[in-house]
From Swiss-Prot:
InterPro entries: Ribosomal_uS15, Ribosomal_uS15_bac-type, uS15_NS1_RNA-bd_sf. It comes from the Bacteria. One of the primary rRNA binding proteins, it binds directly to 16S rRNA where it helps nucleate assembly of the platform of the 30S subunit by binding and bridging several RNA helices of the 16S rRNA. HAMAP family: Ribosomal_uS15_B. One of its GO terms (biological process) is translation. CDD domains: Ribosomal_S15p_S13e (cd00353). PANTHER family: RIBOSOMAL PROTEIN S15, BACTERIAL AND ORGANELLAR, SMALL RIBOSOMAL SUBUNIT PROTEIN US15M. This is Small ribosomal subunit protein uS15. GO terms for molecular function: rRNA binding; structural constituent of ribosome. Part of the 30S ribosomal subunit. Forms a bridge to the 50S subunit in the 70S ribosome, contacting the 23S rRNA. One of its GO terms (cellular component) is cytosolic small ribosomal subunit. Keywords: Ribonucleoprotein, Ribosomal protein, RNA-binding, rRNA-binding.
Length: 89
């Protein structure tokens, strides 16, 4: 299960830092967050799907690493992103 192209483009436009930004930490975290939300919904319907559960854990770890990186490099952007994505704190 992956995000369709239109959804990724929409998220990219919403979180990009400049016009041609497609891979900044902000954009990657936003895309991962959407993918995690979709997987969580899938797991509610299919609780025995262990491959999807492992994929979810992997994505959460990946997002956590990117959030730690963003926090260490630019705390203000980190706090702004956490607020915009309605993540913890």
């Amino acid at each position: 299960m992956s995000l369709d192209k239109g959804t990724k483009e929409e998220i990219t436009k919403k979180f990009q830092l400049h016009e041609k930004d497609t891979g900044s930490a902000d954009v990657q975290i936003a895309i991962l967050t959407e993918h995690i939300a979709e997987l969580k919904e899938h797991l509610k319907r299919s609780p025995k799907d262990q491959n999807s559960r492992l994929a979810l854990l992997k994505l959460v770890g990946q997002r956590r690493k990117l959030l730690e990186y963003l926090n260490s490099t630019d705390t203000e952007r980190y706090k702004n992103l956490i607020t915009r994505l309605n993540l913890r704190k």
